[in-house]
């Protein structure tokens, strides 16, 4: 069909126009911006004094949404934690527009991002923080457990609807109808004899009592 009322905005110009309209507030030099989904992750990151933007259910915020998070934030420069491989590209596009105001630690999930955020120091330089946070993130072995929404086959694994699925990079998918079994096998895929700490984060579908029971 025919397009009407087409409006094109230059995002860099828009960034500076909106900035001029803001009230003048004292911003600190350097901080962390994390993209998260869910109030639980939001609370954990905010406890570490990170600015947070919601990635929504799809974890797919636009470049403009990330830009607004920076524009309306508490810091002059940011280390951005995308926490999803699909968001890394959007963060990189924003970095091209805003230059050294944006620095990226390419976290692919909120567990990696949280570990990196714990290493942030407001007394350290951008370069020192980038190095320390990146090194910490590389030490993390993460996994996620979800439920299958349909019957499927992934690699050699047959998955049935409502099965628990354990997802670990470079490993076959764990699929079973028993949560404890899935948890045990999935943890086995990310741990070694040198593993010292295992942290389990759970969502609304699981109570604290059920979680504690399953990890015993």
PLM feature segments, named:
Residues 1-216:
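N-terminal loops that bind phosphate or other acidic moieties
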């Amino acid at each position: 069909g025919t397009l009407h009322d087409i409006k094109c905005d230059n995002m860099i110009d828009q960034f500076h126009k909106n900035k001029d309209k803001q009230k003048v507030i004292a911003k600190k030099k350097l901080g962390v911006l994390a993209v998260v989904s869910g109030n639980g992750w939001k609370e954990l990151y905010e406890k570490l004094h990170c600015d947070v933007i919601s990635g929504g259910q799809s974890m797919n915020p636009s470049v403009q949404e990330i830009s607004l998070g920076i524009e309306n934030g508490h810091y002059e420069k940011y280390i951005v934690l995308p926490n999803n491989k699909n968001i890394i590209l959007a963060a990189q596009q924003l970095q091209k527009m805003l230059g050294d105001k944006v620095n990226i630690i390419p976290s692919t999930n909120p567990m990696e991002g949280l570990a990196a955020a714990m290493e942030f120091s407001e007394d350290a330089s951008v370069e020192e923080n980038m190095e320390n946070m990146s090194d910490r993130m590389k030490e993390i072995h993460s996994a996620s457990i979800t439920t299958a929404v349909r019957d499927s086959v992934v690699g050699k694994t047959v998955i049935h609807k409502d099965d628990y699925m354990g997802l670990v990079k470079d490993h076959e998918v764990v699929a079973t109808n028993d949560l404890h079994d899935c948890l045990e096998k999935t943890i086995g895929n990310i741990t070694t004899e040198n593993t010292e700490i295992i942290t389990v984060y759970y969502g609304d579908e699981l109570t604290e009592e059920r979680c504690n029971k399953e990890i015993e």
